[in-house]
């Protein structure tokens, strides 16, 4: 039997998705499930091993999360991390204590080099701790394999049962040899095979769609973003013109976006219909300043437009969506519908007349979607397009929306994108855009006093958009942006740079 998959069980830890990503980076497929999921609901074919994540609770609490007890009877190695470490000890008869001194941040680790988990790891290294509880008495059959100044059992193992655990977090970059420790478990102890490759995934998913949906018609709402574009391209390669795509111009797109996106779609051979409903959307938004209300107006009318166009096409039994793995994970946590308000088609209602959803990207993270896009021939510029919110520029204009405010955002955003690309930073910054603010400041243009609006520049770095830092833009670039935006865009009097991280802020201003 092939050993191709690592099962990650989430106990509520903040690094759950990161663990999955770290395993996939090795070329091994990993998937995430809630810890209390019944094993009968999970496909265990080709299972190589199991990882138990961290979590915020104490195993001593009667309400703390618990896993299906059968995970220890599957005959595959298990690795516990943080809470998972304590959980393995607790359920096997050991004890857990809450000392006066918790352990947070970087810590010196000393390991027993006889342990397979620490093969080729120095005896001493830096790791990342984030815990209050710790193992007190080891469960029978276990031995300690690592320690820190404050934690005697920073790692343990029972090799007879292939059970391993660590109190620290090897998945975070702060743990000096964390990735190597994970590799020792996944590739060494579990002997998982490196079969997770985008080239193979592309062939398999296209063949699967072709076989399963032969002769069926499908419809896909395109946003111009990478997820929906890659999803549509995959499905189109499987069923050709039986896929009808709809691209709605709601009047809130970036400069020349509708034209460039449509040219790209045509170049990909997609069967696309563009619907210009910009006047309808802007009329509905007139005078509205509340950000949540603006979102709802746009989302609701998008649904109405999409339903109207879908009825015109007729005969489409399936809806294609660019749902990606973080969406699936979040849906599972919330016990929510697969169709969610943040999806790129605007949150389509469940009562639309379709047999079902087709979600070819539902197993992939954003970076994997980009890799897949490159693999199947989606143009590089499309694959690396900036993430763009469904409500578009409506949430980059603070307050009510007018054509003139949209003009200012479009023009300044175009300058920002052009200069970031000129400086070679367009693929190094996660997201960058401009925001129109209602603040006016005094200035001097020529020999006259000016009184124009402040435009904010936002640029952030991230890997998953869950946490972000303000990008450290070169001062020369910021000077150029300020000069060009103020001189070239009428109505702009001052440029400010937003250095807020997430948390506490969010990426968008509204």
Predicted ranges, named:
Residues 78-84:
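Conserved helicase ATPase motor motifs in RecA-like P-loop NTPase domains
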Residues 1-52, 56-62, 66-74, 86, ...:
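RNA-binding accessory domains that recognize and position tRNA/RNA substrates
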Residues 321-323:
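Extended catalytic-interface subdomain
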């Amino acid at each position: 039997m092939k050993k191709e998959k690592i099962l990650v069980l989430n106990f509520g830890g903040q690094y759950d998705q990161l663990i999955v990503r770290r395993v996939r980076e090795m070329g091994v497929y990993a998937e995430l499930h809630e810890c209390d999921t019944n094993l009968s609901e999970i496909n265990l074919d080709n299972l190589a091993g199991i990882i138990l994540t961290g979590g915020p609770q104490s195993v001593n609490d009667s309400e703390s999360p618990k896993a299906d007890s059968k995970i220890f009877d599957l005959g595959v190695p298990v690795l516990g991390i943080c809470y998972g470490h304590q959980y393995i000890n607790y359920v096997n008869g050991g004890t857990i204590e809450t000392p006066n001194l918790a352990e947070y941040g970087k810590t010196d680790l000393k390991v027993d080099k006889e342990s397979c988990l620490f093969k080729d790891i120095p005896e001493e290294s830096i790791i990342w701790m984030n815990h209050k509880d710790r193992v007190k008495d080891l469960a029978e059959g276990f031995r300690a394999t690592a320690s820190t100044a404050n934690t005697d059992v920073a790692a343990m193992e029972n090799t007879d049962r292939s059970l391993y655990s660590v109190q620290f977090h090897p998945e975070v970059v702060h743990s000096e040899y964390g990735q190597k420790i994970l590799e020792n478990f996944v590739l060494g102890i579990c002997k998982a095979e490196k079969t997770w490759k985008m080239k193979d995934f592309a062939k398999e998913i296209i063949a699967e769609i072709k076989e399963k949906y032969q002769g069926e018609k499908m419809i896909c709402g395109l946003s111009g973003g990478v997820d929906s574009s890659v999803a549509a391209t995959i499905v189109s390669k499987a069923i050709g013109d039986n896929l009808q795509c709809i691209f709605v111009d709601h009047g809130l797109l970036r400069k020349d976006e509708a034209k460039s996106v449509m040219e790209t779609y045509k170049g990909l051979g997609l069967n696309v219909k563009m619907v210009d409903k910009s006047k309808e959307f802007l009329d509905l938004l007139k005078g509205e300043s509340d950000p949540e209300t603006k979102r709802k107006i746009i989302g609701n009318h998008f649904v109405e437009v999409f339903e109207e166009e879908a009825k015109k096409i007729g005969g489409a039994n399936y809806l294609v969506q660019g749902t990606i793995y973080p969406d699936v994970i979040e849906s599972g946590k919330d016990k929510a519908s697969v169709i969610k308000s943040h999806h790129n088609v605007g949150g389509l209602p469940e009562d639309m007349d379709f047999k079902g959803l087709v979600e070819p990207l539902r197993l992939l993270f954003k970076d994997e979607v980009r890799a897949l896009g490159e693999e199947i021939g989606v143009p590089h510029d499309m694959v690396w397009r900036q993430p763009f919110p469904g409500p578009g520029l409506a949430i980059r204009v603070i307050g009510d929306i007018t054509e003139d405010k949209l003009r200012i955002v479009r023009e300044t955003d175009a300058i920002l994108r052009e200069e970031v690309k000129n400086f070679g930073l367009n693929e190094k910054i996660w997201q960058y855009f401009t925001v129109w603010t209602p603040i006016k400041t005094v200035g001097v243009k020529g020999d006259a006093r000016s009184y124009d609006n402040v435009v904010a520049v936002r640029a952030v770095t991230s890997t998953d958009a869950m946490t972000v830092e303000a990008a450290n833009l070169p001062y020369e670039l910021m000077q150029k942006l300020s000069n060009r935006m103020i001189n070239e865009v009428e109505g702009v009097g001052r440029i400010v740079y937003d250095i807020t991280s997430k948390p506490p802020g969010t990426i968008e201003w509204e």
